[in-house]
């Protein structure tokens, strides 16, 4: 049963939360989910060791998570080849990338995703970083969610030819 937003607590993720976050990630995979990372939460965590991590708790249980990190803008450009898509480097030296977010299906649509994303954004601002999120352009749910929070589409589209 869904909880009221007032009963949700956002806090920093600790090691004891990793198993639950991995479980939530598995619960959220399916036909209605677009995955921007080609691997699981466990693999992501093992490779990237994210520097920004939050969980949402309801009644003392973890019901959602968000993870990502802050990198220097120059490194961000080389990773995503976005050299000509951002503001001049003198404006924003640090970029906070929100990489993964997961909400237990039983606790959706009560503001947890919004609260986690806001916490991530505040942490980026605290560290003097701009916040960026990569999403598939046909992920209408995520696009609508992000736009409702004030994010704008950067207009970047990656084309490919196999």
Residue ranges of each PLM-predicted region?
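A short beta-loop-alpha structural element at the N-terminal edge
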Residues: 6-23
């Amino acid at each position: 049963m869904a909880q009221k937003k007032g009963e949700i607590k956002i806090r920093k993720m600790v090691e004891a939360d990793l198993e639950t976050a991995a479980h939530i990630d598995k619960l959220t995979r399916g036909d209605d989910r677009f995955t921007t990372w080609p691997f699981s939460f466990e693999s992501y965590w093992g490779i990237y060791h994210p520097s920004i991590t939050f969980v949402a708790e309801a009644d003392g249980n973890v019901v959602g998570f968000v993870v990502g990190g802050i990198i220097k803008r120059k490194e961000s450009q080389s990773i995503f080849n976005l050299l000509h898509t951002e503001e001049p480097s003198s404006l924003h030296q640090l970029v906070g990338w929100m990489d993964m977010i997961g909400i237990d299906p039983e606790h959706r649509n009560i503001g947890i995703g919004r609260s986690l994303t806001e916490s991530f954004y505040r942490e980026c601002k605290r560290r003097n970083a701009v916040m960026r999120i990569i999403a598939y352009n046909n992920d209408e749910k995520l696009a609508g969610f992000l736009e409702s929070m004030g994010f704008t589409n950067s207009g970047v589209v990656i084309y490919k030819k196999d």
